[in-house]
């Protein structure tokens, strides 16, 4: 506003009118239309005749959508996401391409059957292989840097026979040779204090999960998969023909519904499913730049370099 001889009262009135008008516009923007208020064209394109509905636009949700598209090239697929971005752990995790540190596997073998442990490792490896087929390494900044399992001063080192057993199983089950080895030079390499030993895994690596989510999203758009962001599924009901999905914007109908919310699935299932609380700490730039991915305490703690 340019003052051309106008009084301060006049200026204040003009500013007040402009501010009030802008505020009113913002208020209108914040109030989103309900589904039943959309136009015919909007309902036809975005809400009607969807075969598959997917709750959650994270790694699992978008991967599920892409797998469905591969099997059903012409069916309508829709992903419903409660946030304006994926709000779960997909873009908050550390970005480890991992399948099992040796102390983690030892802990698993002590608490579940041997068959189940190696079945779990097989699923992890299969998932990583599928991911690398679907997304190029440069699209998710994948680095085959390996990983280190760090043993604290008050922890017991692994027996050489146990490390040999892990390598034998990895070779027999998955064709991977010399996966685990002790790294006698880790202290000189990294300068860590408080650790007495480290075991190296030659096949693990790191991923930029932000880039990965972006790559999957672009693939979904190219595959004609629809997204409804800022749409929270509150509950659903089903019959023999379809599933009615209720959101804060109204209800819509799909033939099949996939719940891909992982830790948040307790909102939909009457089970004792509770997500574990996790905390991420981000340091300032370190003088001694550490490259790689690292685990400790049976895989419950882990850290890596970024940037």
How does the language model describe each region?
Residues 5, 10-52, 70-71:
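Extreme N-terminal leader/targeting segments of oxidoreductases
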Residues 48-50, 247-256:
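Core beta-strand elements of the Rossmann-like FAD/NAD(P) dinucleotide-binding domain
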Residues 50-78:
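N-terminal Rossmann-like FAD-binding beta1-loop-alpha1 element of flavoenzymes
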Residues 71-92:
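Glycine-rich FAD pyrophosphate-binding loop
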Residues 82, 138-144, 251-252, 256-307:
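Active-site substrate-recognition segment that forms the wall
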Residues 88, 92-122:
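Glycine-rich active-site loop/strand segments that organize a redox cofactor
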Residues 103-109, 133-218:
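Flavin (FAD/FMN) cofactor-binding and adjacent substrate-gating region
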Residues 198-240, 246-248:
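Helical element adjacent to the flavin cofactor pocket in flavoenzyme catalytic cores
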